[in-house]
Amino acid sequence: MKNINPTQTSAWQALQKHYDEMKDVTIAELFANDSDRFAKFSATFDDLMLVDFSKNRITEETLAKLQDLAKETDLAGAIKSMFSGEKINRTEDRAVLHVALRNRSNTPIIVDGKDVMPEVNAVLEKMKTFSQAIISGQWKGYTGKAITDVVNIGIGGSDLGPFMVTEALRPYKNHLNMHFVSNVDGTHIAEVLKKVNPETTLFLVASKTFTTQETMTNAHSARDWFLKTAGDEKHVAKHFAALSTNAKAVGEFGIDTANMFEFWDWVGGRYSLWSAIGLSIILSVGFDNFVELLSGAHAMDKHFSTTPAEKNLPILLALIGIWYNNFFGAETEAILPYDQYMHRFAAYFQQGNMESNGKYVDRNGNAVDYQTGPIIWGEPGTNGQHAFYQLIHQGTKMVPCDFIAPAITHNPLSDHHQKLLSNFFAQTEALAFGKSREVVEQEYRDQGKDPAQLEHVVPFKVFEGNRPTNSILLREITPFSLGALIALYEHKIFTQGVILNIFTFDQWGVELGKQLANRILPELGDDKAISSHDSSTNGLINRYKAWRA
């Protein structure tokens, strides 16, 4: 992978000039000047997904110049490097191969001279056998009862991905009740333990090293709770499984290492739902549906790695994002799924994007002088319309939005879905085209009112429009289409990281806080006043000690 400062390319300079020409052009003008705009600025994927990027402040010239930027930063070479197993995560000397986990073609993928696919398939087969025993009731707890509840204990990538997918695929779930515990706040696990029975509960402890502070604190609390009823430590083996690579620590915890499911250092946490970390997904929706999830992602992997850049959906979305972030000064992107099952999708890609591309040091080790990763946020529609859409429509900040919706709902109650989708379509139209003063005044006339008498209200009812959006319309949310959608966003993030010359697959920014927390923890063990930090931290710790007493 080449290390190229994007701002030093001729394409970046051309884009800066182009921005000066485009900054006052409106989306309404772009549509008025081109009756075929939708056809030119939209594309389908496998007849399962339509991506409409026509309601953006872009022209064919804009996209051509952005594609030039991708060429000058050698995006094509970087894609080949990732898929071929090159160690593109250079700060940790690791390959980046979540694509191998869903490589349904079984084409060899080589890391350090070794094909990883046999090991990937072996773990998949092991998960299949284990999950079938749990789901069928063949696996019994220590009193001979079948498992009814599964508690996944993890944090970050070991929690966000499985939680998001199991929620998104709820229509496919079986009889097992799924619970997720992540926060080290004891309230989280305490509330989950109130809902489950130790005789019929399986705990999945998801920690690659089996040393993650939050996860192991929760795991030990779960173990203590379990043993209060079960008594004999040998029963732990029937109620705990590990998603880890540390066999020694897993065995010491009391888990049978036969029920330890491995993954590899080339699997990043926030890209790990496709690995053994996805065992909770399998237990929720069954192995066949998990394979469909993998297959959907693999189909998008093929699209990303083989489709020309001009028609490549992850690349197009990535380039449009860079256009707004670096030239228009937009600092955030909203992800707005119009599907209640997808209520954790924005939170998942908040981590996916911000932990990947929230970096200020480039691949040469130098501080950047341009924008890198955006702030990602969002909530399901239509809830967001009654919360923060006011700012998106009439605020002073540009917030590019991705609207996501299925054409077919899993719950066709009366006309609920038509009403939901009418809002989905209306919002992007309103954001793009707005409402002029003239239209507001005419509406008053149509109501028999004199606009002159309402002059004090008219300005507040004007919508400037020109707010950019992408619309992603799925035929239906299935395991396959969800897998493709997740992979679409993963590759968008990777593309932006390549072009912006940052390392997308490390996360050193999470380390300092953990180091300081480990230093502070022993200081909280007594009631002595603390003076070893800055005055603010000392003051906070000392007030905490005074109040807890």
From Swiss-Prot:
Pfam family, one: PGI
Gene: pgi
Record's subcellular location: Cytoplasm
Main EC class the enzyme belongs to: isomerase
Classification via PANTHER family: GLUCOSE-6-PHOSPHATE ISOMERASE
Keyword Cytoplasm: yes
Provenance organism: Salmonella paratyphi C (strain RKS4594)
Source lineage: Bacteria, Pseudomonadati, Pseudomonadota, Gammaproteobacteria, Enterobacterales
Record-stated family: Belongs to the GPI family.
Protein name: Glucose-6-phosphate isomerase
Keyword Ligase on entry: no
Keywords, alphabetical: Cytoplasm, Gluconeogenesis, Glycolysis, Isomerase
One MF annotation (Gene Ontology) recorded for this entry: carbohydrate derivative binding
Gene3D superfamilies documented for this protein: 1.10.1390.10, Glucose-6-phosphate isomerase like protein, domain 1
CDD domains with a match to the protein in the record: SIS_PGI_1, SIS_PGI_2
Enzyme active site: 355, 386, 514
